């Protein structure tokens, strides 16, 4: 074969290849959708279903929470040993706020920052402050005391928000301090102060000695485990908890340096 013939045949083959269809490895037959798009649609359906379920759950919890009448909290004021937070020394209120809910005056019933901080404290074995706000604890202690379910926690948030809308902070703090268990069948702060120390939390009282800074810190530290912490025989863990509370009270300006040092001296005797 001549060289010119070989060249001519090569050109004819090249021209033929140009007109042939080219298929790549991603070719899909007509009418069959790509697998990626199908997977994406399934994922979106799953996410949408989850969102609908969550929305329905929240809606049901909100409806159930409306059965709890926050007006009933006023009944706490009828207790014989009730003392309003307005009539307590600042360091008494500060002992509980520092330990349980240091952002009490800045939130509206739920504190995401405080809850997150409490979670990390628990993880690092520094369980000093609870994750629930004082308002949430008021709701739990009054309406859901024996309920430990997740649904209770959700309802608690809705009711706590209503409590914050209806009552001022001192009223909420009063409900808390007069409806919490201190051990030995004591459910008010005044009753606990009378029972354990022979003192009163009423700053206007002239018949009894007023509760001290240390005594306030002890009672505030006890409510976390009232049946475990023994005031008459304080464990190392309980003592450390009280010490931490006193330090927090000083940091948050509920007590000054002199009061702090005096309380620490009494604690370490």
Swiss-Prot record:
Question: Entry's Pfam families?
Answer: Transgly (PF00912)
**GO BP annotation list:** cell wall organization; peptidoglycan biosynthetic process; regulation of cell shape
EC class (word)? transferase
Q: Name one GO cellular component term.
A: outer membrane-bounded periplasmic space
* Keyword entries, A-Z: Cell membrane, Cell shape, Cell wall biogenesis/degradation, Glycosyltransferase, Membrane, Peptidoglycan synthesis, Transferase, Transmembrane, Transmembrane helix
Does the entry annotate any disulfide bonds, and if so which pairs? none
Known EC number: 2.4.99.28
Q: How does it sit in the membrane?
A: Single-pass membrane protein
Where found in the cell? Cell membrane
* Reaction(s) catalysed by this chain's protein: [GlcNAc-(1->4)-Mur2Ac(oyl-L-Ala-gamma-D-Glu-L-Lys-D-Ala-D-Ala)](n)-di-trans,octa-cis-undecaprenyl diphosphate + beta-D-GlcNAc-(1->4)-Mur2Ac(oyl-L-Ala-gamma-D-Glu-L-Lys-D-Ala-D-Ala)-di-trans,octa-cis-undecaprenyl diphosphate = [GlcNAc-(1->4)-Mur2Ac(oyl-L-Ala-gamma-D-Glu-L-Lys-D-Ala-D-Ala)](n+1)-di-trans,octa-cis-undecaprenyl diphosphate + di-trans,octa-cis-undecaprenyl diphosphate + H(+)
**Can you tell me where the transmembrane regions are?**
46-66
Instruction: Give one GO term, molecular function aspect.
Output: peptidoglycan glycosyltransferase activity
Pathway it works in: Cell wall biogenesis; peptidoglycan biosynthesis
Q: What does this protein do?
A: Peptidoglycan polymerase that catalyzes glycan chain elongation using lipid-linked disaccharide-pentapeptide as the substrate.
Family the entry assigns: Belongs to the glycosyltransferase 51 family.
State the NCBIfam families in the record.
PRK13481.1
Instruction: State what protein this is by name.
Output: Monofunctional glycosyltransferase
Natural source organism? Staphylococcus aureus (strain Mu50 / ATCC 700699)
Q: Which gene encodes it?
A: mgt
């Amino acid at each position: 074969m001549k060289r010119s013939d070989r060249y001519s045949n090569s050109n004819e083959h090249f021209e033929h290849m140009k007109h042939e269809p080219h298929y790549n490895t991603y070719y899909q037959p007509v009418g069959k959708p790509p697998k990626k798009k199908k997977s994406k649609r399934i994922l979106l359906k799953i996410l949408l279903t989850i969102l609908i379920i969550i929305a329905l759950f929240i809606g049901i919890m909100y409806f159930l929470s409306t059965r709890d009448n926050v007006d009933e909290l006023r009944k706490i004021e009828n207790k014989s040993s009730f003392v309003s937070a307005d009539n307590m020394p600042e360091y008494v209120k500060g002992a509980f706020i520092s330990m349980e809910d240091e952002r009490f005056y800045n939130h509206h019933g739920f504190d995401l920052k405080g809850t997150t901080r409490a979670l990390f404290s628990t993880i690092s074995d520094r369980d000093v402050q609870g994750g629930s706000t004082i308002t949430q604890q008021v709701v739990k202690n009054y309406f859901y005391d024996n309920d430990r379910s997740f649904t209770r926690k959700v309802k608690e948030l809705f009711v706590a928000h209503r409590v914050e809308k209806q009552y001022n902070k001192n009223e909420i703090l009063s409900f808390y301090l007069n409806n919490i268990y201190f051990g030995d069948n004591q459910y008010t702060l005044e009753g606990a102060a009378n029972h354990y120390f022979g003192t009163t939390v009423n700053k206007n009282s002239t018949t009894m000695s007023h509760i001290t800074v240390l005594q306030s810190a002890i009672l505030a530290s006890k409510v976390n485990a009232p049946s475990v912490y023994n005031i008459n025989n304080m464990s190392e863990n309980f003592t450390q908890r009280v010490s931490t509370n006193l330090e927090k009270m000083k940091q948050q300006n509920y007590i000054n340096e002199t009061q702090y040092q005096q309380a620490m001296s009494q604690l370490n005797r």
